[in-house]
């Protein structure tokens, strides 16, 4: 089993990197605070993104349900239209008002009365 280089902290690597000036503890502290602040901001951003995705998912589900309800209503209304059209067609075959020729020629003042049974 080969051993890798000894574990070195991120701060130590930045100090040991070529071209870097040795940093003061104050600079190190500032860097740690900045990284912590960045980490917290990243967590907040991920949380916000997750919440937004959850909200969109809920809205999608709600719209799907509404769509389903509306499709069922359309189906019922189409069936009702079909039924009422059939009823009307059957009624037209035997309606005395529609069969009366006086409905089409306006000779009297009250053409409906002449078609009604006496």
UniProtKB/Swiss-Prot annotation:
Region entry Basic motif, spans: 30-55
Keyword field: Activator, Differentiation, DNA-binding, Nucleus, Phosphoprotein, Repressor, Transcription, Transcription regulation
Gene3D superfamilies the record matches: 1.20.5.170
Source organism superkingdom: Eukaryota
Main location: nucleus
Extra information: The increased protection toward L.monocytogenes infection in mice lacking Batf3 suggests that CD8-alpha(+) classical dendritic cells (cDCs) and CD103(+) dendritic cells are an entry point for infection by L.monocytogenes.
UniProt family annotation: Belongs to the bZIP family.
Null mutant phenotype: Selective loss of CD8-alpha(+) classical dendritic cells (cDCs) and CD103(+) dendritic cells, without abnormalities in other hematopoietic cell types or architecture. Dendritic cells are defective in cross-presentation, and mice lack virus-specific CD8(+) T-cell responses to West Nile virus. Mice also show reduced priming of CD8 T-cells after pulmonary Sendai virus infection, with increased pulmonary inflammation. Mice are extremely susceptible to T.gondii infection, with decreased production of interleukin-12 (IL12) and interferon-gamma.
Known tissue expression: Highly expressed in CD8-alpha(+) classical dendritic cells (cDCs), with low to absent expression in other immune cells and non-immune tissues.
Positions where Phosphoserine occurs in the chain: 2, 24
Protein name: Basic leucine zipper transcriptional factor ATF-like 3
Annotated stretches, region: Disordered: 1-69
SMART domains, alphabetized: BRLZ
Role of this protein: AP-1 family transcription factor that controls the differentiation of CD8(+) thymic conventional dendritic cells in the immune system. Acts via the formation of a heterodimer with JUN family proteins that recognizes and binds DNA sequence 5'-TGA[CG]TCA-3' and regulates expression of target genes. Required for development of CD8-alpha(+) classical dendritic cells (cDCs) and related CD103(+) dendritic cells that cross-present antigens to CD8 T-cells and produce interleukin-12 (IL12) in response to pathogens.
SUPFAM superfamilies linked: Leucine zipper domain
Entry GO MF terms: DNA-binding transcription repressor activity, RNA polymerase II-specific; RNA polymerase II cis-regulatory region sequence-specific DNA binding
Biased composition, class Basic and acidic residues, residue ranges: 51-69
Protein location: Nucleus
GO biological process, one term: dendritic cell differentiation
Domain (bZIP) ranges: 28-91
InterPro entries assigned to the protein according to its UniProt record, in alphabetical order: AP-1, bZIP, bZIP_sf
Summary of subunit composition and partner proteins: Heterodimer; heterodimerizes with JUN family proteins. Interacts with JUN.
Species whose genome carries this gene: Mus musculus (Mouse)
Region (Leucine-zipper) location: 56-84
GO annotations of cellular component type: cytosol; nucleolus; nucleoplasm; RNA polymerase II transcription regulator complex
């Amino acid at each position: 089993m080969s051993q890798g280089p000894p574990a070195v902290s991120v701060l130590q690597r930045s100090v040991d990197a070529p071209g870097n000036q040795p940093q003061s503890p104050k600079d190190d502290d500032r860097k740690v605070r900045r990284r912590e602040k960045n980490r917290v901001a990243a967590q907040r951003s991920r949380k916000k993104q997750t919440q937004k995705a959850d909200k969109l998912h809920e809205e999608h589900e709600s719209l799907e349900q509404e769509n389903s309800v509306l499709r069922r209503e359309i189906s019922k209304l189409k069936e009702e239209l079909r039924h009422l059209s059939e009823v009307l067609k059957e009624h037209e075959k035997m309606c005395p008002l529609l069969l009366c020729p006086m409905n089409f020629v306006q000779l009297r003042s009250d053409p409906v009365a002449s078609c009604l049974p006496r």
